[in-house]
Amino acid sequence: RLMEDKPYYRAALAAQTLHYVPPERRNFFYHVTALDPWPLYSHDIHWMELARIKHEPNSDPIRRTAPLFNIFQSRSEGFATALEELAMHEGLYDDVPRGRELVWIMLANRAARGLASLHVQANEWTLAEAGRFHARWTPRGYSDPDNPLVGFEQLLYLRQPGYGTSYVTGKAELDALIADAAAADEARPAADVLADVFAMLNREGSVPFALYPRRAR
């Protein structure tokens, strides 16, 4: 078990229940969830974290309240993106092995749209050019450059530089944090190390990964 079960976790996730969307109305995420909703449900750790802030606020008076600026991009999106893969490695798709393909497709989409966003921020590409790159490098044709979601995402990332790449860079930061913890105590079972890292994330609150305690470098 990656983390302790809480009743409010279940309620938060249940509120995000997805519905079937016909093929002609699907954007990237609906193509994925039509086959298996679990990759996106894993990403919905966001809602569980928000519920924890409400039901179990951090003991630190500074970390308990909303900051005056957005520092949560890599921490929140990186954690949610990493959890998609961590849940897979913990056995979520053992009975549906092709579900693993969707986890990798989700990551490929984040990488494509994040890289495209950097070119827009550098004034090298237009939003339309970014959308075409974004769609071209998303597997299976699941992303359409003319779909409103693609335009919305690229405009969002232009307005918030660093956000588009934070899914992948934040995941890499969490992967490194887990690797450091495992290297510091190689005799411990990997599942125990991972559970300790998750407990530390919950205890310390939503702050940039660089501010979390590191057991090894």
Predicted regions span which residues?
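Long, His/Glu/Asp-enriched segments that create or flank divalent metal/ion-associated functional microenvironments
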Residues: R1-R217
